[in-house]
Swiss-Prot record:
Protein's name according to its UniProt entry: Proline--tRNA ligase
Top-rank lineage group of the source organism: Bacteria
Subunit record text: Homodimer.
NCBIfam families cross-referenced by the UniProt entry: PRK12325.1, proS_fam_II
Gene name in the database record: proS
Native source species: Rhodopseudomonas palustris (strain ATCC BAA-98 / CGA009)
EC numbers on record: 6.1.1.15
Task performed by this protein: Catalyzes the attachment of proline to tRNA(Pro) in a two-step reaction: proline is first activated by ATP to form Pro-AMP and then transferred to the acceptor end of tRNA(Pro). Can inadvertently accommodate and process cysteine. The misacylated Cys-tRNA(Pro) is not edited by ProRS.
Length: 438
């Protein structure tokens, strides 16, 4: 993509309404525009990152055996009355009526609807286990939306729902999602720590939040530093095998949110040098809730013994849009964003340091064509901005690799390659650049 043809509305000044780094940088980098309190338009740069995050989430759900579908944003109020949650949710749930006075709501989550879909079609244990997921926009009418995508009212979420004939099967499904989440966040360059958490209005007695450490996080957390060094399973993990050793390894090291923190246990189990009390950002949460919804909504299957019984369920959420904020909070410096390569809007940016110079233009065009032909996402800054402004923009938007092309270097047949993450630079022959980056 040529920057001269791209829509990238960079802001020179820090927006006054932005309280945290991620919100400030997303607005400055032209990723978002606020349309109402807690509601944002996703501009091209932000949308590219959002789609890359979404795809990683999708790939890891599929790898773990979950099946994608798509449910609507609007739900019937009667479904929520059936489960007993309609009145349990407060004013954060947006309730509306259509022209026929039918009561609807803008779904904050989908346990009721997926249970209704399940009970309409699945009657026998032979169809289980089953895990269905979708990636869809949600709405929760936060009283004080703030911090950009970190606490917005409209947000993109992946929610998965597992169905099993008994508790043992449901816990296996829970473990699959636990491991899938470890892999999902690691692929995005994040160290997300699973922590025991309260279940809240979702229900059940088992839940883990996945927390990215950040001083701007909304949750206080207490961890044993050893958890920071635990290995994440690779892509060859056998989801049909026994995942218990992985789960035990990650849950035997102390890590808890402030809601379920046990001070006495923490002090007795964790050496003082290993204790870390900090803050974190929740990027996902998983729940086992047993028969909470199948009991009230009569989602039964015929078991091996021929009798009907309610299914055991779990739900598993990832805040897809929230992840952009979490990644920026964890990956930035004073100059801007530092995107991990897996989620970067572009992998490489070419900076033409003397637009209009024939040799410089030709070298940039050559690199742009050759890298694009290799399938590399390239943003070519072919604008007439001065070199300093181009450097500042490239650092702000955080593209992992910058290629600086100017007459001085080309006089020696060289261009400069800069790695955004640490500022490391190397001079390369023009002919060697494509091989270096592919």
């Amino acid at each position: 993509m040529r920057l001269s043809r791209f829509f990238l509305p960079i802001l020179k000044e820090n927006p006054k309404e932005a309280e945290i780094v991620s919100h400030r940088l997303m607005l400055r980098a032209g990723m978002l525009r606020q349309e109402a309190a807690g509601i944002y338009a996703w501009l091209p740069l932000g949308h590219r990152v959002l789609k890359k995050i979404e795809q990683i989430v999708r790939e890891e759900q599929n790898r773990a055996g979950a099946i994608e579908l798509l449910m609507p944003t609007l739900q019937l109020a009667d479904l929520w009355r059936e489960s007993g949650r309609y009145d349990a949710y407060g004013p954060e749930m947006l309730r509306i009526a259509d022209r026929h006075k039918r009561e609807l709501l803008y779904g904050p989550t989908n346990e009721e609807m997926i249970t209704e879909i399940f009970r309409a079609y699945i009657k026998s244990y032979k169809s289980l286990p089953l895990n269905l997921y979708h990636i869809q926009w949600k709405f929760r009418d936060e009283q004080r939306p703030r911090f950009g995508v970190m606490r917005g009212r409209e947000f993109l979420m992946k929610d998965a729902y597992s169905f099993d004939v008994d508790e043992a099967g449901a816990r296996k499904s829970y473990n699959k999602m636990f491991v899938a989440y470890l892999r999902t966040f690691a692929r995005m360059g994040l160290k997300a720590i699973p922590m025991r958490a309260e279940t809240g209005p979702i229900g059940g007695d088992l839940s883990h939040e996945f927390i990215v450490l950040a001083e701007t996080g909304e949750s206080g957390v207490y961890i044993d530093r050893d958890v920071l060094n635990l290995p994440v399973p690779d892509e060859n993990v056998d989801y049909d095998g026994d995942l218990t050793p992985i789960i035990k390894q990650w849950t035997s090291v102390y890590a808890a949110t402030e809601d379920v923190h046990e001070p006495a246990r923490y002090e007795s189990e964790v050496p003082e040098a290993n204790r870390l009390n900090t803050r974190g950002i929740e990027v996902g949460q998983i729940f086992y809730f047993g028969t909470k919804y199948s009991d009230s909504m009569k989602a039964n299957v015929t078991g091996p013994d021929g009798t009907d019984a309610p299914i055991h369920g779990g739900s598993y959420g990832v805040g897809v849009s929230r992840l952009l904020g979490a990644i920026i909070e964890a990956c930035h410096d004073d100059n801007g964003i530092i995107w991990p390569e897996a989620v970067a809007p572009f992998r490489v940016t070419i900076l033409n340091l003397k637009q209009g110079d024939a040799a410089t233009d030709a070298a940039c065009d050559q690199l742009y064509r050759e890298l694009s032909a290799k399938g590399v996402d390239v943003l070519y800054d072919d604008t007439d901005q001065r070199a300093g402004a181009k450097f500042a923009t490239a650092d702000l938007i955080g593209i992992p690799w910058q290629i600086h092309v100017g007459p001085r270097g080309l006089a020696e047949g060289k261009v400069e390659l800069k790695r955004r993450s640490d500022g490391a630079r190397e001079n390369l022959a023009l002919a060697d650049v494509v091989a270096r980056l592919t």
